[in-house]
């Protein structure tokens, strides 16, 4: 619970080009970004949206519909959550860039 790092295997985009992982690499100053191929920025500009559109085009996290239930001769209104016919919001552009969760730099304030 709480782990939000990527689970993809393979080349890590923020790995240093120096390679090696011995004691000499531990003492050396850590390079920030040295990708092997194309340069990968440490920032995230978009995210996956967490809201949904319903049939009417309304945007919300959850949708409910009112149903009338008759029990012992009494009519009662209940809310039922709608799960069908919802369209995901898709990709949302962030207002300002954020640092990628897998970027290997610790930020601190003095």
UniProtKB/Swiss-Prot annotation:
The keyword Metal-binding does not apply. This is Tumor suppressor candidate 2. May function as a tumor suppressor, inhibiting colony formation, causing G1 arrest and ultimately inducing apoptosis in homozygous 3p21.3 120-kb region-deficient cells. GO terms for biological process: cell maturation; inflammatory response; natural killer cell differentiation; negative regulation of interleukin-17 production; neutrophil-mediated killing of gram-negative bacterium; phagocytosis; positive regulation of interleukin-10 production; regulation of mitochondrial membrane potential. The modification Phosphoserine is found at residue 50. It comes from the Eukaryota. Belongs to the TUSC2 family. Keywords: Cell cycle, Lipoprotein, Myristate, Phosphoprotein, Tumor suppressor. Strong expression in heart, lung, skeletal muscle, kidney, and pancreas, followed by brain and liver, lowest levels in placenta. One of its GO terms (cellular component) is mitochondrion. Myristoylation is required for tumor suppressor activity. A lipid is attached at residue 2 (N-myristoyl glycine).
